[in-house]
Amino acid sequence: MITEEILKVLLEDCEKAYFEKEIPVSAIIVDKDNNIVSHCFNKRQQNNRVIDHAEILSILEASNKIGDWRLNGYSMIVTLCPCKMCTEVIKESRLDNVYYILESKYYNSLSTSDFTKIEVPKEYEEKLNKLLTLFFDNMR
């Protein structure tokens, strides 16, 4: 399910978010053949909109590409377990599956039973964790 290409795009998007002073979270939506349909990172600061989380932006981009808000037959891979707001948008979009890499240490997310935690090569998990840690450490 999770290819090297997907992991690289997720990491690259997290790095872009970090350097743009955004929380380094990214999301990808893939079709049933694992083709990337959309990918985004958080842009709350950049766009000055509280709702511009990676998950929501990826859903909007995918919906625009396929011409339908219903994302049946598509799956999302996100670097951090989605927050409550994103969880509700994900449910409304009708994605078939949502996979996440990291648990959230920084805020309470909904029950993770709605989503599937996936194991990725340790190097990716460590890099993603490091970006989040650096981001939040630099905020203080």
What is the predicted function of each stretch?
Residues V25-N34:
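Short beta-strand scaffold segments in enzyme catalytic cores
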Residues D68-L80:
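Immediate flanking context of iron-sulfur cluster ligation sites
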Residues S38-R44:
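Short beta->alpha transition motifs characteristic of CBS
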Residues S38, E55-N64:
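Glycine/small-residue-rich phosphate/adenosyl-binding loop
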Residues Q46-I56:
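A short, polar/charged loop-to-alpha-helix boundary motif
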Residues M1-E20, P82-R140:
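Zinc-dependent deaminase
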Residues I23, R70-N72, R94:
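Short loop/turn motifs at secondary-structure junctions
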